[in-house]
Amino acid sequence: MHITIDRDAVCAADDMSHHREEFTVPDGITIASLFEFLEFKYIPVIARNNVVWALYHHEIKVGAYFTKIGSFVNGNIPLSSIISNSERDNEFYLRYYSSPDRYRKHFI
């Protein structure tokens, strides 16, 4: 399955490059497996590693990854079900939160 992912910049220097990339992933990949796949290929390393990456599919938050504790929101959901249920394309977006508290405040 081909997917396109874009992401937030994490610092001023990171703003200098484009973040939109295409990946080929297994058809049955879950949200947790996607984050594990992207962690070494795409997601930037952050000092102290206590950040949250939220995964969006066209403005709808479908999952999240808490990097310090290695925990996922909706980790077992396959990307293919998200795509087929939405009748939209294979584009996703990763939103960066500099701490779990900032992530929680955004949704409360």
Where are the predicted features?
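Short, conserved charged micro-motifs
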Residues: T30-S33
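Ubiquitin system architectures
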Residues: I5-F23, F35-I108
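Extreme N-terminal starter segment of soluble prokaryotic enzymes
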Residues: M1-H2
